[in-house]
Design a protein with these regions (language model features):
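Acidic catalytic patch
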Residues: 92-108
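Helix-adjacent hinge/juxtasegments
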Residues: 56-96
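Basic/polar N-terminal segments that are highly enriched at the extreme N-terminus
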Residues: 1-4
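Short, contiguous alpha-helical
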Residues: 7-11, 15-21, 28-68, 105-154
Length: 154
């Protein structure tokens, strides 16, 4: 396993999240799926909050200075800072896991699967965000919709 490639994959995933966040206007953070559930801002917050949940379970010392994003007062600056910082903390967890037998505490089977799990979870929420914006009548630019798949240029 190449530790650097694993960490770079995680970094790419987060850059895709930030790319999508940048494409959503502040007022569209309130857009929600027709089937209810979280709005766009809450979806981004959930991504951050799930990272914190895993840090608490696997590397609680990395949680210092972090707080969960609550439903009220969600704005793009808070989301950008939170996603950037929680991604860096997950990166620390990955580096630690790679250097300590490839295991993430409280997750099976190994660190590579953990990156796959987090990436899949976050990609699911990116799709929820895109659908919510579209269903609310605020289509994202096609460049962005294709751009989230261009990992080689992110």
């Amino acid at each position: 396993m190449d530790a650097q490639q694993l960490i770079e994959t995680w970094q790419l995933n987060n850059r895709i999240n930030l790319y999508l966040l940048d494409a959503v206007s502040e007022e569209h953070l309130a857009d929600a799926l027709l089937s209810k559930g979280r709005n766009v801002g809450e979806q981004f917050a959930h991504i951050h909050n799930v990272r914190l949940m895993w840090l608490k379970a696997a590397m609680p010392e990395a949680l210092r200075g972090f707080s969960k994003i609550e439903k009220s007062g969600i704005g793009k600056p808070l989301l950008r800072d939170s996603l950037t910082n929680s991604a860096a903390a997950i990166e620390q967890l990955l580096a630690f896991a790679v250097g300590n037998g490839g295991r993430v505490k409280n997750f099976k089977p190994h660190v590579t699967a953990f990156v796959g799990y987090l990436t899949a979870q976050e990609a699911h929420h990116r799709s929820q965000i895109i659908i919510a914006v579209k269903q609310s009548g605020h289509a994202l630019d096609k460049k962005v919709l294709y751009g989230i798949w261009e990992w080689g240029s992110r």
